[in-house]
Amino acid sequence: MIKKILILLFLLLITAYLIVAVTAFNTKPADQVCKGMELIIKDSIDHGFISQKGILRLLNGKKLSPVGKKMGDINTRLLEEELSQHPLIENVECYRTPGCKIGIEVTQRLPILRVMANNGDNYYIDNKGKIMPIPNSSAHVAVVTGYVDRDFAVKELYTLGVFLQAHPLWDAQIEQINVTQAKELELVPRVGEHIIFLGKPGNYEEKFEKLKTFYEKGLNQVGWNKYSRISLEFNNQITVSYTHLTLPTTP
């Protein structure tokens, strides 16, 4: 008797399982409800301009959160368009996952220079040569000061920023770029008490190669604080100005 009851219960469980399995199999993916989002923010370790909370807050604020909606009713293209309007986002990809979730991959804009001009302008130049607003967190890039207009920044200074990003030695060494009224460039290094005068923008490969040679064969021998100014303005030569020392007066 007990054996028959157990067999009956087993058959009932098998029947219930088959009913659930068939129902789930026949349910169209479009009718399934979105269970959540999988957010991926690229370069989040180096640049924390955008957070997952910020993305969620933006979607909820525009009533675009896909969670709880039918997968077939979710417009991933609309999500991409809305998120791409954020001034700190470079690219967005939205897609459906097999687990009934919406995947969102965000690429942040990458700043290469910060401009703090005499005219009051304060912004970043990104790696595409476009003006970028100041986010809540700061980026460790060279600061540009002086007589800087936006046209000069995105054309002339952008190429210098790209050069610095491509050369880790100079990216680490150059702390500030000052633009004079004559649109000539002065660099303030992190190491050393000198000013590096580049002159007019351009010829960065040649100028910095000269500076590297001077560092290795000159400053390493005489000391990093011997000169107050190192000029790379002219081809095939470097001119320097000595640091003026104040001598103690005799009693």
Where are these regions (language model features)?
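Hydrophobic membrane-insertion alpha-helices, especially the h-region
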Residues: 7-21
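Aromatic-capped interface at the extracytoplasmic side
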Residues: 19-39
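Flexible glycine-/small-residue-rich
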Residues: 41-43, 104-110, 136, 146, ...
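Periplasmic/extracytosolic POTRA-like scaffold domains at the N-termini of outer-membrane
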Residues: 44-85, 133-136, 140-162, 199, ...
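Membrane-embedded segments
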Residues: 80-110
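Short, glycine-/polar-rich solvent-exposed loops and beta-turns at beta-strand/coil boundaries
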Residues: 94-100, 179, 223-224, 232
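Extracytoplasmic segments of membrane-associated envelope/inner-membrane machinery
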Residues: 105-181
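Conserved small/polar residues in nucleotide/adenosyl-binding loops
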Residues: 243-249
